[in-house]
Amino acid sequence: PYVKNAGARMKKYEIDRKAYSDGKLQDNDIVLFRYADVLLMLSEAKVRNGESGDNELNLVRQRVGASNRTATLENILNERLMELMWEGWRRSDLIRFNKFNKDTTGKSGDKTLFPIPYEAKELNPNLK
């Protein structure tokens, strides 16, 4: 009753239907840290220190048959996006690379504004 067939799912963490014991719990393993993450962190650290991180970046890429790349911060961030998808690292990566509050609306990216809820404006006409 708790497993639904509708909607999109990421294959990386597919539900193990055979592992249900009480109809609610699944026995899927989740990834905490991976060697590819360690290699990408090392590559990033080397690049930030003025060294070459090409070897570490390309070890990750070679595993999936991708061509070699020069380790730049932009290439490392893109590789982290592809390699660590759905593992919960993207927000931290964007903050660390100073791209989280990127200007997307033509306004300064240093402030976040939230709209006033419609219900609050209806209750208080002074809110505009």
Give the role of each language-model region.
Residues 1-34:
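Flexible, polar/acidic helix-loop-strand segments at domain edges
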Residues 4, 36, 118-120:
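A generic alpha-helix propensity feature with a strong bias for hydrophobic helices
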Residues 8-11, 57, 74, 92:
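A broad, low-specificity signal marking well-ordered, structured residues that form hydrophobic/aromatic
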Residues 14-17, 39, 66, 85:
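Intrinsically disordered, low-complexity segments enriched in polar/charged small residues
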Residues 25, 30, 61, 68-128:
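Long, intrinsically disordered, low-complexity segments
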Residues 29-59, 74-85:
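Extended, hydrophobic/aromatic-rich amphipathic alpha-helical segments that build helical scaffolds
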Residues 51, 66-69:
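Short, glycine- and charge-enriched coil/turn segments that flank and shape catalytic ligand pockets
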